[in-house]
Design a protein with these regions (language model features):
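Unchanged
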Residues: 9-111, 115, 124-159
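Long, low-complexity, intrinsically disordered segments
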Residues: 161-164
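Short, His- and charge-rich active-site/binding loops that engage polyanionic ligands
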Residues: 1-10
């Protein structure tokens, strides 16, 4: 299966993207709003399918035990942030098959789980903005058109801890 953070499409009853993230976290892993300490929001990203994704960052209690909704997800696992700080764990692949320009995908392998694509980019941005850690690999290909660079790496809308 595909590895990702809890999330999904905004429903009519959701008042904001943040509300969507809270609802999806509750639906997928049983995380209740009272257990979430909002930290900030990463810049929006454009998925390969043209969906605008709004990543939120939160702290949750150490003792939280996920209640997996098997209709939504297959499994849930934890990865220590220190794993992503190790440059040997970070792989970069260059692709040419999607359109006329080359692009990069970022990859991590952790205990049989393949963490890649937008999920990997979100982690890279979190480490960059939250810890000041800069990856040895660039987030996007230098020859990618400007709109791809903007979609993958908005520097002007950096981590904003006051937006909910």
């Amino acid at each position: 299966g595909h590895v990702s953070f809890p999330g999904g499409k905004r429903d009519q009853e959701d008042k904001s993207d943040y509300d969507t993230s809270v609802r999806e976290s509750q639906e997928e892993v049983g995380l209740e709003q009272e257990q979430i300490y909002f930290v900030g929001k990463l810049e929006q990203m454009l998925s390969p399918h043209g969906c605008l994704v709004s990543p939120f960052v939160a702290r949750i209690p150490n003792q939280f035990k996920p209640r997996i909704n098997e209709a939504e997800i297959e499994s849930c696992f934890w990865v220590p942030l220190s794993f992503f700080l190790d440059p040997e764990q970070h792989q970069l692949r260059q692709h040419h098959e999607k359109g006329p320009y080359p692009h990069f995908t970022h990859h991590f392998q952790f205990e049989g789980y393949h963490i890649w694509g937008m999920t990997a980019l979100m982690i890279i941005r979190l480490l960059e903005l939250g810890l000041g850690h800069h990856s040895i690999h660039p987030p996007h290909h230098p020859r990618a058109p400007h709109w791809i660079a903007v979609a993958q790496n908005h520097r002007e809308n950096s981590f904003n801890p006051s937006v909910a």
